[in-house]
C-alpha cells in the first residue's frame, strides 16, 4: 500500500480508505479490492460480509501484488511519464486537457467528441466518451504503456488532420 496516500488513518476515527487492484496492478478481472479502516469498523463489516466473497486465487494474487513494491514503483513511473506525454501532445493538437493524478486524462478535442470517439474506435483505439456523465464534449483516455500512448496519439492526430481538411 502506498503510505503517503493514507496520512489521516488513525487520526480520523471513521475514515475508510478503499483500494482496487484493477488499475495499479492490472487485475481488473479478479474484481478484487480492500479497505483500510479502524478495527472496530472492520469487525462490524465482517459480520455482514458474504461468505466466500473472494475466491482463493484472487486472494493469493492480491496478497502477492501487495508485496511487489518494484512493480508498483515501475507502474507509477510509466503512468507519470505517460500522463505528461499525453497532456503535452493532446494540448499541442488543440485539445483542452484537465489536470490529473490518475491513470487517465479527461480532454476536450477541437472537434465533436463523439465523432472523434467513433473514428478512433474504427481504428481500433478505445477511449471513453463522457456524454453519459453530462459532459458530451469531453473524452477520457486511459494512460497505457509507451507503445499504446504513441498509437493513441498518432491515430488521434490523423483523425484531427482529416477533420481539419474536410472542415
Locations of regions flagged by a protein language model:
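PLP-dependent aminotransferase class I/II
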Residues: 14-91, 95-98
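Short hydrophobic/aromatic beta-strand micro-patches
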Residues: 36, 106-108, 142-144
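Conserved PLP-binding catalytic core of the aspartate aminotransferase-like
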Residues: 79-80, 84, 88-123, 139
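PLP-dependent enzyme catalytic core of the Aspartate aminotransferase-like
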Residues: 119-123, 128, 132-167
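Short acidic/glycine-enriched loop/turn segments that link adjacent beta-strands
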Residues: 29, 101-102, 134-137
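Conserved small/polar residues in nucleotide/adenosyl-binding loops
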Residues: 1-5
Amino acid at each position: 500500500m502506498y503510505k503517503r496516500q493514507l496520512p489521516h488513518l488513525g487520526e480520523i476515527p471513521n475514515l475508510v480508505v478503499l483500494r482496487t487492484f484493477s488499475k495499479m496492478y492490472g487485475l481488473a478481472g479478479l474484481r478484487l479490492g480492500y479497505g483500510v479502516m479502524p478495527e472496530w469498523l472492520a469487525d462490524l463489516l465482517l459480520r455482514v460480509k458474504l461468505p466466500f466473497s473472494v475466491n482463493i486465487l484472487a486472494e493469493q494474487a492480491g496478497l502477492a501484488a501487495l508485496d511487489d513494491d518494484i512493480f508498483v514503483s515501475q507502474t507509477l513511473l510509466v503512468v507519470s511519464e505517460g500522463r505528461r506525454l499525453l497532456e503535452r501532445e493532446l494540448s499541442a493538437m488543440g485539445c483542452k486537457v484537465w489536470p490529473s493524478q490518475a491513470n487517465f486524462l479527461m480532454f476536450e478535442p477541437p472537434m465533436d467528441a463523439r465523432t472523434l470517439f467513433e473514428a478512433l474506435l474504427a481504428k481500433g483505439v478505445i477511449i471513453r466518451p463522457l456524454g453519459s456523465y453530462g459532459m458530451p464534449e469531453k473524452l477520457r483516455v486511459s494512460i497505457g504503456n509507451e507503445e499504446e500512448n504513441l498509437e493513441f496519439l498518432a491515430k488521434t492526430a490523423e483523425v484531427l488532420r482529416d477533420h481539419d481538411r474536410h472542415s
